[in-house]
């Protein structure tokens, strides 16, 4: 007996990937006159992409539990809590932090990530290929679209490295290079 929407979708559609997952294929390499410093930069980026907090190491996210609410956080009807209030940790893994005065979950991370990373989630389904110390190949998914801000930040932080970034979002049928 089928008991959930997920099971119904699996029965109807099989094991297909739902749209709005953007596939990213990134190749990072030196200039051809690779030095130990270039190789060290490639190794550092490899480590960053292998970690769970990939984008947060490239463009650091604020420490939300220690960020008091600002007046601007409560504009446009998004009343999270009282000005200056800190979110409190709760044991629910889905909500994690709540403003006690309103009971509303702290969602400030969402707008910040969209504005600063161009996507709501960090990289996921990451596969790193590092057969060559002078080159790094990484494939991963992001929500909705490629994280253009992350691509630009890597190029800015590592000017001696070349970055080739291809993305493909099959749900909306767009692809290209950054």
Please provide the spans of the model-predicted regions.
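N-terminal amphipathic/basic-hydrophobic helices that include classical n-h-c signal peptides
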Residues: 1-17
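Long, contiguous binding/interaction regions
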Residues: 12, 16-178
């Amino acid at each position: 007996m089928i008991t959930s929407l997920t099971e119904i979708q699996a029965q109807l559609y099989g094991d297909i990937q739902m749209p709005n997952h953007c596939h990213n294929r990134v190749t990072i390499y030196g200039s051809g006159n690779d030095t130990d410093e270039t190789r060290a930069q490639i190794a550092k980026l490899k480590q960053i992409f292998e970690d769970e907090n990939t984008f947060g190491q490239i463009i650091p996210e604020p420490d939300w539990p220690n960020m008091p609410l600002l007046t601007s956080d409560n504009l446009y009807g998004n009343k999270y809590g009282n000005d200056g209030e800190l979110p409190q940790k709760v044991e629910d893994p889905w909500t994690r932090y709540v403003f006690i005065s309103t009971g509303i979950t702290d969602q400030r991370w969402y707008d910040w990530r969209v504005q600063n990373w161009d996507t709501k989630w960090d990289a996921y389904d990451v596969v790193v290929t590092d057969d060559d110390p002078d080159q790094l190949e990484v494939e991963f998914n992001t929500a909705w679209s490629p994280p253009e801000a992350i691509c630009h930040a890597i190029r800015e932080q590592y000017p001696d490295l070349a970055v080739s970034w291809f993305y493909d979002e099959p749900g909306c049928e767009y692809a290209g290079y950054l």
